A protein has these predicted regions:
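Active-site nucleophile-adjacent alpha helix/oxyanion-hole segment immediately C-terminal to the catalytic cysteine
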Residues: 1-60, 76
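Contiguous, function-dense segments enriched for cysteine-driven chemistry
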Residues: 1-14, 84-88, 93, 132
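Intrinsic disorder/low-structure terminal segments
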Residues: 4, 71, 135-136
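Polar low-complexity intrinsically disordered regions enriched in Ser/Thr and small residues
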Residues: 13-14, 57-58, 66, 132, ...
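Functionally constrained cores in energy, signaling, and assembly domains
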Residues: 33-34, 41, 106-108, 132, ...
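Conserved active-site-adjacent core of cysteine acyl-enzyme catalytic domains
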Residues: 51-104, 110-112, 116-119
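Noncatalytic regulatory segments and standalone regulatory/sensor domains
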Residues: 116-142
Length: 142
């Protein structure tokens, strides 16, 4: 299955937070996968960041630390699947909603379609042209 791409900011512009580029890929990916507002997702991650750092850090504006995003997702029923040695194009995400983790970036994939602000399906760092897939989060239904 070939992944397709659709540009999406996860509702950031609609939330009145502008369109400036910032390290907000985790916020955007979670907002899309959870089908909740960007502002609500950002507030939840900021609260967790503040709690986990004892107040030393207050905002995920310039990137969300991995322990914070991992806890946020696992607390909401997501399970991490590690995919060592595979590439994004090696996986079939048809009929699934996942948050894919590639080097230095996270993206939402809904039914085989990457929803992101840029076409993150491509990489110039690999021979196959697809980024390495470190793992992905998928919600487990109870």
């Amino acid at each position: 299955m070939t992944l397709t791409f659709k540009k999406s900011d996860g509702g950031k512009a609609d939330s009145g937070l502008g369109t400036a580029r910032s390290g907000d890929c985790v916020i955007r990916a979670i907002a899309i996968a959870e089908q909740q507002g960007y502002r609500k997702t950002k507030a939840g991650l900021n609260d967790l960041l503040h709690e986990m750092t004892g107040g030393l850090q207050r905002s995920c504006n310039d990137g969300t630390p991995l322990p914070v995003s991992h806890k946020y997702l696992t607390d909401r029923g997501y399970v991490l699947t590690l995919t060592k040695g595979t590439y994004l194009c090696d996986n079939d995400f048809t009929g699934r909603t996942v948050i894919a983790c590639i080097p230095r970036h996270n993206m939402a994939i809904v039914n085989g379609q990457v929803l992101d602000t840029w076409d993150s399906r491509k990489s110039r760092r690999t021979k196959c042209g697809s980024p390495k897939l470190e793992g992905f989060y998928e919600k487990v239904s109870n």
